[in-house]
Amino acid sequence: MELVSIIIAAYNCKDTIYATVESALSQTYKNIEIIICDDSSTDDTWDIINKIKDSRIICIKNNYCKGAAGARNCALKIAKGRYIAFLDSDDYWVTTKISNQIHFMETEKVFFSYSNYYIEKDFVITGVFSSPPEINYGAMLKYCNIACSTVILDRTGVKNISFPYIDKEDYALWLNILSKGIKARNTNLVDTYYRVHAGSVSANKFKELIRQSNVLKSIGIKAHHRIICLFYYAINGLIKHCFSYRDKRNA
């Protein structure tokens, strides 16, 4: 059984971090290490994570705020697992998440996998998002339907994992990986709870479009090509929110 390193970047998340960590500890797949990097929180986050006693947890703290990319990269530097899983500090998993996804990756010979997820708002499940069955670089330029908390990477195929220091850093990393010819595959399971907060950046569609453009510019996509990609991104965003969410009663 290969070691899975679970990376959690935490910043001022005292109300959600306990449930997040507990969902990682409750995995049926037992060969895990959980690396939590507190990004210089100003609330009780650090105290809460240090009260969770389990030998599989490694807690580190940044002396100053480095952002989500910096916190994840600090955790990645000490990760020992063949597999790297990401879990945002306000999301959580079903207990079989890791076990099922590793089985899928080993069986299908996949280096980059992701899954579908529940949408939770104000502690109520409002729907389910189904990601595409497979995503390559060209498709990823036009939309990002991969939630960070659903991803597991195999370091035997994905080398030198590091988040770029830019807004939408997870999307930028996925593009970097896929640009090398690797394809991302969906397990087709719904195993992650993605929490949406009022006023969050990902919920603000105008800001999201600007961030999308900045990522494309940072990787050298020319202006005319960016416009085309952003057009598709906007259309896909509309389709995503109108048609891709299934009512929770049908999940």
From Swiss-Prot:
Keywords: Cell inner membrane, Cell membrane, Glycosyltransferase, Lipopolysaccharide biosynthesis, Magnesium, Manganese, Membrane, Transferase. It is a peripheral membrane protein. It catalyses: N-acetyl-alpha-D-glucosaminyl-di-trans,octa-cis-undecaprenyl diphosphate + UDP-alpha-D-glucose = beta-D-Glc-(1->3)-alpha-D-GlcNAc-di-trans,octa-cis-undecaprenyl diphosphate + UDP + H(+). It comes from the Bacteria. InterPro entries: Glyco_trans_2-like (IPR001173), Nucleotide-diphossugar_trans (IPR029044). Its EC number is 2.4.1.305. Optimum pH is 6.5. It is an enzyme of class 2 (transferase). GO terms for molecular function: hexosyltransferase activity. Gene3D superfamilies: Spore Coat Polysaccharide Biosynthesis Protein SpsA, Chain A. It is found in: Cell inner membrane. The keyword Ligase does not apply. It holds the Pfam family Glycos_transf_2. GO terms for cellular component: plasma membrane. CDD domains: Glyco_tranf_GTA_type (cd00761). Its cofactor is Mn(2+); Mg(2+). One of its GO terms (biological process) is lipopolysaccharide biosynthetic process. Pathway: Bacterial outer membrane biogenesis; lipopolysaccharide biosynthesis. Catalyzes the addition of Glc, the second sugar moiety of the O56-antigen repeating unit, to GlcNAc-pyrophosphate-undecaprenol. Belongs to the glycosyltransferase 2 family. This is UDP-Glc:alpha-D-GlcNAc-diphosphoundecaprenol beta-1,3-glucosyltransferase WfaP. The lineage of its organism: Bacteria, Pseudomonadati, Pseudomonadota, Gammaproteobacteria, Enterobacterales.
